[in-house]
C-alpha cells in the first residue's frame, strides 16, 4: 500500500479503489490507500491521476460509494451515513460527466418539434461513408409550421423545405431524421412520411427536394426512426400502428389508393402541386397497439428487430422479417418516448421509456428477464417526450420533457426507492439539468409553461441539441460531457 497522505487535522480514511473500465485498472498493490478525511472528488481525482497511481495526467473522475456519487468530503459522507473514520470505503471511479455548457440558440417562426444532427460521428455521417466531409456538420429541425430547416453550426439556415403546395408537408411535422448527408426523412400530422434529397451548391446554400411520399397511416405520425445502411424507416402513429418502410421507390410497394391526397376530392377540387414525388406504401403496417403508438426504434445491433412503445402501457419487441410481435412487456403507465441503450457485449439493449407519470423507466426487453423494470429515473416535473443515448458512454442518456428541461442521467448512480416512490426497485436521479436559456430566472405557474421540450439528440461533435415550444433550437456543448 502507498505511503499515507495526511491532512491538517491528521484524520485519515482507508479507501479501496475499483473500476469497471478496463483501460483504467490499478495494480492490486495500489488499490488500497489512506487518504485525508477531508478529501473530496477533485482531490481523489488528483490522487488517481498521479504518477504513482494511474499516471494519466488530468482525467476528471467521479466516485461512486454504494451506488451514489460522492458529493461531499469523505468525512462528511461517513458522518451522514453513521459510519466511523475506521471504516474502509470502496470507491468506484468512473470518467466524469462534465456539465454541458450553453452555446447557442437558433430562432424559428413556430414551435420546434424535432431535431437531428449530421456529423462525422453521427449515425447518418457514418452511413454517408466517404461522401461526408469532416467539418460540414449540419443540424436538422422540424417545426409546427410544416417546414424543415437545415442549419450549419454557426446558426445559418442552409436550406428550407418547400410548403405543402410545392410538395412539402401539409400540416405540422412531428419527426425528422438524416439518413445520409444527401437524404433525410420526415413525418407528421398530415399522416405521411416524406423522403427528401438534399444537395448543397456551396457551404452556405442548399436545396431540399421531395422524392418519395409514403402513405399507410390513418393518424398523426409522431415518431420516426431510420437506418441509412438498409434504407429503412420505422414510424409510430396515433392510429396504434407501427410502420416499416423503404426509402427506395423500386422496392416500396404501391400505396393504398384510398389514402392518397386526391382519393376523396372531387375533380373540381383536385389537389395540385408544382412538384410530383413518387407515392408508395409500407413494407409492413402493424396495428399492434390498442392506443396511440408513441415511438419505435431499431435494435442497435440487429436491424431486423424493433421495439415500440405506446400509450396502451406496453412495450413490444417486433420481428421485422415476419412483422410479428415477439414479446410484450406491460408497464404501469402510458409510454410517451423510447430509446435503446447498447449494453457492452450483451446481445440485448436496455430500453429507456418516458412515461405519463413523469419518470423514465428502464426495461430489459428479453423474454427471460426476471422483472420488467430494471430502474426508474426520477426528476422531471412534466412528461419526458424525448430520449437519446449518449454517443460515447453506455451508462448515460439525455431526456427532454414538457417541464422545459433536458436532463443528463448516469445509470451508475443508483439508490433504493423510498416508501413515497413505492419502496421497490432502484432509482437514479439526473446528474445535470439543462434549462431553456430564455426561461432562466422566470417563474412559471406550470412546469415548462411556454418552453416545453419536444425533441433532443446527443451528438459527439456538436453536443446536446434540443427543440422546444420556445421556437428555438438550443445547443449545449456536450463534446466533453463524458470526459475522455
From Swiss-Prot:
- Per the record, which residues fall in region Ubiquitin-like (UBL) domain? 13-95
Q: Which Pfam families match?
A: NLE, WD40
- Superkingdom classification of source: Eukaryota
Q: Where in the cell is it found?
A: Nucleus, Nucleolus; Nucleus, Nucleoplasm
| Keywords from the named record | Nucleus, Repeat, Ribosome biogenesis, rRNA processing, WD repeat
Entry's Gene Ontology BP terms: chromosome organization; maturation of 5.8S rRNA from tricistronic rRNA transcript (SSU-rRNA, 5.8S rRNA, LSU-rRNA); maturation of LSU-rRNA from tricistronic rRNA transcript (SSU-rRNA, 5.8S rRNA, LSU-rRNA); protein-RNA complex remodeling
Xref: InterPro entries: G-protein_beta_WD-40_rep, NLE, WD40/YVTN_repeat-like_dom_sf, WD40_repeat_CS, WD40_repeat_dom_sf, WD40_rpt, WDR12/Ytm1
Can the keyword Iron be found in this entry's annotation? no
Of the GO CC terms on this record, one is:
nucleoplasm
The answer, when asked if Nucleus is one of the entry's keywords, is yes
The protein's job, in short, is:
Component of the NOP7 complex, which is required for maturation of the 25S and 5.8S ribosomal RNAs and formation of the 60S ribosome.
Tell me its family: Belongs to the WD repeat WDR12/YTM1 family.
Task: Describe its assembly.
Answer: Component of the NOP7 complex, composed of ERB1, NOP7 and YTM1. The complex is held together by ERB1, which interacts with NOP7 via its N-terminal domain and with YTM1 via a high-affinity interaction between the seven-bladed beta-propeller domains of the 2 proteins. The NOP7 complex associates with the 66S pre-ribosome. Interacts (via UBL domain) with MDN1 (via VWFA/MIDAS domain).
Name of the protein described by the UniProt record: Ribosome biogenesis protein YTM1
Species name for this entry?
Chaetomium globosum (strain ATCC 6205 / CBS 148.51 / DSM 1962 / NBRC 6347 / NRRL 1970) (Soil fungus)
Q: What is the lineage of its organism?
A: Eukaryota, Fungi, Dikarya, Ascomycota, Pezizomycotina
Amino acid at each position: 500500500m502507498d505511503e499515507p497522505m495526511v491532512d491538517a487535522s491528521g484524520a485519515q480514511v482507508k479507501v479501496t479503489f475499483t473500476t469497471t473500465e478496463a483501460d483504467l485498472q490499478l495494480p492490486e498493490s495500489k488499490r488500497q490507500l489512506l487518504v485525508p478525511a477531508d478529501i473530496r472528488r477533485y482531490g481523489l481525482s488528483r490522487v488517481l491521476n498521479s504518477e504513482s497511481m494511474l499516471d494519466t495526467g488530468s482525467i476528471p473522475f467521479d466516485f461512486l460509494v454504494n451506488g451514489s456519487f460522492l458529493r461531499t468530503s469523505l468525512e462528511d459522507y461517513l458522518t451522514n451515513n453513521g459510519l466511523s473514520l475506521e471504516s474502509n470505503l470502496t470507491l468506484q471511479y468512473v470518467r466524469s460527466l462534465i456539465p454541458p455548457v450553453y452555446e447557442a440558440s437558433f430562432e424559428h417562426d413556430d414551435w420546434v418539434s424535432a431535431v437531428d444532427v449530421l456529423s462525422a460521428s453521427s449515425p447518418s455521417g457514418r452511413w454517408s461513408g466517404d461522401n461526408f466531409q469532416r467539418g460540414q456538420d449540419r443540424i436538422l429541425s422540424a417545426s409546427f409550421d410544416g417546414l424543415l430547416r437545415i442549419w450549419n453550426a454557426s446558426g445559418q439556415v442552409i436550406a428550407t423545405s418547400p410548403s405543402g403546395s410545392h410538395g412539402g408537408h401539409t400540416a405540422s411535422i412531428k419527426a425528422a431524421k438524416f439518413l445520409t448527408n444527401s437524404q433525410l426523412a420526415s413525418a407528421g400530422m398530415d399522416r405521411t412520411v416524406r423522403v427528401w434529397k438534399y444537395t448543397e451548391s456551396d457551404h452556405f446554400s442548399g436545396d431540399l427536394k421531395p422524392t418519395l411520399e409514403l402513405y399507410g397511416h390513418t393518424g398523426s405520425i409522431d415518431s420516426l426512426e431510420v437506418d441509412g445502411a438498409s434504407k429503412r424507416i420505422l414510424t409510430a402513429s396515433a392510429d396504434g400502428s407501427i410502420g416499416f418502410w423503404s426509402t427506395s421507390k423500386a422496392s416500396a410497394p404501391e400505396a393504398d389508393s384510398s389514402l392518397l391526397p386526391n382519393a376523396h376530392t372531387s375533380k373540381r377540387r383536385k389537389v395540385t402541386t408544382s412538384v410530383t414525388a413518387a407515392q408508395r406504401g409500407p413494407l409492413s403496417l402493424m396495428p399492434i397497439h390498442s392506443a396511440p403508438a408513441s415511438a419505435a426504434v431499431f435494435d442497435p445491433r440487429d436491424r431486423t428487430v424493433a421495439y415500440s412503445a405506446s400509450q396502451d402501457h406496453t412495450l413490444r419487441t417486433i420481428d421485422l422479417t415476419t412483422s410479428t410481435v415477439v414479446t410484450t412487456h406491460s408497464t404501469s403507465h402510458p409510454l410517451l418516448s423510447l430509446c435503446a441503450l447498447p449494453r457492452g457485449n450483451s446481445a440485448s439493449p436496455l430500453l429507456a421509456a418516458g412515461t405519463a407519470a413523469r419518470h423514465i423507466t428502464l426495461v430489459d426487453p428479453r423474454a427471460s428477464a426476471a422483472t420488467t423494470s430494471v430502474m426508474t429515473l426520477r426528476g422531471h416535473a412534466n412528461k419526458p417526450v424525448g430520449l437519446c443515448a449518449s454517443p460515447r458512454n453506455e451508462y448515460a442518456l439525455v431526456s427532454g420533457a414538457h417541464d422545459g428541461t433536458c436532463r443528463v442521467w448516469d445509470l451508475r448512480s443508483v439508490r433504493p426507492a423510498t416508501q413515497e416512490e413505492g419502496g421497490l426497485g432502484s432509482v437514479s436521479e439526473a446528474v445535470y439539468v439543462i434549462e431553456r436559456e430564455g426561461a432562466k430566472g422566470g417563474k412559471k405557474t406550470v412546469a415548462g409553461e411556454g418552453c416545453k421540450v419536444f425533441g433532443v439528440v446527443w451528438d459527439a461533435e456538436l453536443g446536446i441539441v434540443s427543440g422546444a415550444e420556445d421556437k428555438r433550437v438550443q445547443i449545449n456543448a456536450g463534446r466533453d460531457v463524458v470526459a475522455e
